[in-house]
C-alpha cells in the first residue's frame, strides 16, 4: 500500500501544515489550481517571531483553502518541555553547553496535534514544508502515522511537477503575484530560523560555514550578549520545584506552564542564557550545524539538575544521565512517543523527578555565565556535618570506622595488582619512565 503520494491527489482533501510563509502559501495555491482540496492547519507554538496568529488562517482561506484552523499547541508543548527537563532528555552538547532539543519537541507536538485535527475534518492526506535532506520529514512521517494509521503523505517538495514549476523562492513569488496576491518576499537573511515557545534554531545558508558563527545571528529570544555595547546587568532569580514541576519564579507562584515558560524566557533572555553553537548528527548520519536559543529551558535545567545532585545518590544520578542521553537521541529521531522512550521518560518522572522539591537561587550575568547562590530542599541528602572538617557531636563515623573501610579495599587492590602484572608480562604495559601506568616488575613478590 502506497503511503507517500508523488503526484497531486486531485479531487481529494489534502491537509497542509500552513505557516503563512511563501513556501506553504505557494504550495497551497498550486495544489488548489491542480484540483486538490487544500485544508490548512496552523500550529500556535508560541513562536516568539510571530506577530499575528489569527491572520494566518485568514491568509490560507484567501489563497484557496477549503477550511483553515489555528490549533493552540502551547499547553502541550510546555508540558512536553517540562517532561524533557525532568528526564534530562538532551544528548547534544559542546563544552558543557547543552542543546535542549526544542525543535524535536515542537515537531512531536505539531505532528500529533495537527494530524488529530485533520482526522476531525475527515482529512487523511498530509503535507508539510520539510525537505528530503532534513530531520523533520522523518519526524512528521512517524508522528503523523502514529496518530492516524490511515494517513497518506503528499509533499509538494517531493513532487517533480511542483519542483519543475515552482522550484525556488523567486518562482514562488512570481507565481503568487500572477495569481493576484502580490506576495512580496521578505528580505533574505544570512540564515534561516525556526522557533517555538521553548527555543529557536538558526541554521543553513551562511551558518553552514564553520567560519561564520554566532556573531551574525540576531537573537529573537534574548540579547546579543557578545556585543560589548549591549548592556547586561547581573540579576538574581529563584526557581521553585514541587515534585519535579516548576511552580514558582522569584517566589511568585505560576500555575500555568505556558506562562511559566514565557516568564523564564523573559528572565533568561535578558542575559542571552541558553544560546549554543552545535555540530550534530542528523537522523541520516550526516552532520549539520545550528545555533540555538532556549533561555527558559536553560534556567529550568540548571535549577533542576542542582536539586537532582543534592537529593539523589550517585548511582541514581548516573542512571538518570545515561537514560537522558538515550532518551534525547530518541526524541531527536522523532520517537518521543515510542514505547522505549515512554519507558525511559516515565522512569525519570517517577523515580527521579518525584523527589525534586525545593528552590534554587542563581545569579545570571552575560550569556551562559551564572553562579548558584543557594539551594534549599526538604529532601536534600547533602548534610555538611557528615564531612565537616570541624569537630562535631554525634559524628556519623569515626577514624576507626574509616580504617576498617580502607582495610577492606585491600581485597580489590590485590586483584588489581595481579591483573596489572598479567598485562605487564603480556607486554601491554610499557616500562618507559614517562608512562602514566603503574610500573610493575614481571615477578610476583
From Swiss-Prot:
Any GO BP annotation: urea cycle
Annotated binding of L-aspartate, by residue: 131, 135-136
Residue numbers binding L-citrulline: 99, 135, 139, 192, 201, 203, 280
Catalytic activity: L-citrulline + L-aspartate + ATP = 2-(N(omega)-L-arginino)succinate + AMP + diphosphate + H(+)
The entry's keywords: Amino-acid biosynthesis, Arginine biosynthesis, ATP-binding, Cytoplasm, Ligase, Nucleotide-binding
Localization in the cell: Cytoplasm
Signal sequence residues: none
Oligomeric form and interacting partners: Homotetramer.
The name this protein goes by in its record: Argininosuccinate synthase
Organism in which the protein naturally occurs: Ralstonia nicotianae (strain ATCC BAA-1114 / GMI1000) (Ralstonia solanacearum)
Amino acid at each position: 500500500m502506497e503511503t507517500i503520494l508523488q503526484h497531486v491527489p486531485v479531487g481529494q482533501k489534502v491537509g497542509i501544515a500552513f505557516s503563512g510563509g511563501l513556501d506553504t502559501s505557494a504550495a497551497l495555491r498550486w495544489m488548489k489550481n491542480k484540483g486538490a482540496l487544500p485544508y490548512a492547519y496552523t500550529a500556535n507554538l508560541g513562536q516568539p517571531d510571530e506577530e499575528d496568529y489569527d491572520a494566518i488562517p485568514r491568509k490560507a482561506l484567501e489563497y484557496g483553502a477549503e477550511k483553515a484552523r489555528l490549533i493552540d499547541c502551547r499547553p502541550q508543548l510546555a508540558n512536553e518541555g517540562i517532561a524533557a527537563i525532568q528526564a534530562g532528555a538532551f544528548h547534544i552538547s559542546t563544552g558543557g553547553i547543552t542543546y535542549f532539543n526544542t525543535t524535536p519537541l515542537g515537531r512531536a507536538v505539531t505532528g500529533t496535534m495537527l494530524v488529530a485535527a485533520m482526522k476531525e475534518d475527515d482529512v487523511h492526506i498530509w503535507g508539510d514544508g520539510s525537505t528530503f535532506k532534513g530531520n523533520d520529514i522523518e519526524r512528521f512521517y512517524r508522528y503523523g502515522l502514529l496518530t492516524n494509521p490511515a494517513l497518506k503523505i503528499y509533499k509538494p517538495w517531493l513532487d517533480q511537477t511542483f519542483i519543475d514549476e515552482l522550484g525556488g523562492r523567486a518562482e514562488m513569488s512570481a507565481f503568487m503575484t500572477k495569481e493576484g496576491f502580490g506576495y512580496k518576499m521578505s528580505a533574505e537573511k544570512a540564515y534561516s530560523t525556526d522557533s517555538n515557545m521553548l527555543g529557536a534554531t538558526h541554521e543553513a545558508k551562511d551558518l553552514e560555514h564553520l567560519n561564520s558563527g554566532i556573531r551574525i545571528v540576531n537573537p529573537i529570544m534574548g540579547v546579543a550578549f557578545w556585543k560589548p555595547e549591549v548592556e547586561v546587568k547581573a540579576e538574581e532569580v529563584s526557581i521553585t520545584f514541587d515534585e519535579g514541576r516548576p511552580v514558582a519564579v522569584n517566589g511568585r507562584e505560576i500555575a500555568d506552564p505556558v506562562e511559566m515558560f514565557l516568564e523564564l524566557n523573559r528572565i533568561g533572555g535578558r542575559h542571552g542564557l541558553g544560546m549554543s553553537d552545535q555540530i550534530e548528527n542528523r537522523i541520516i548520519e550526516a552532520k549539520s550545524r545550528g545555533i540555538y536559543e532556549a533561555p527558559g529551558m536553560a534556567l529550568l535545567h540548571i535549577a533542576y539538575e542542582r536539586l537532582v545532585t543534592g537529593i539523589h545518590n550517585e548511582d541514581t544520578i548516573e542512571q538518570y544521565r545515561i537514560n537522558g542521553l538515550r532518551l534525547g537521541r530518541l526524541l531527536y529521531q522523532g520517537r518521543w512517543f515510542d514505547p522505549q522512550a515512554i519507558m525511559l521518560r516515565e522512569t525519570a518522572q517517577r523515580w527521579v523527578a518525584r523527589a525534586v522539591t525545593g528552590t534554587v537561587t542563581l545569579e545570571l550575568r552575560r550569556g551562559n555565565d551564572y553562579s548558584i547562590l543557594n539551594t534549599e530542599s526538604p529532601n536534600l541528602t547533602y548534610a555538611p556535618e557528615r564531612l565537616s572538617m570541624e569537630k562535631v557531636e554525634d559524628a556519623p563515623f569515626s577514624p576507626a570506622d574509616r580504617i576498617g573501610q580502607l582495610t577492606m579495599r585491600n581485597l580489590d587492590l590485590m586483584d588489581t595488582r595481579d591483573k596489572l602484572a598479567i598485562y605487564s608480562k603480556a607486554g601491554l604495559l610499557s616500562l618507559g619512565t614517562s608512562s602514566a601506568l603503574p610500573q610493575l616488575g614481571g615477578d610476583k613478590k
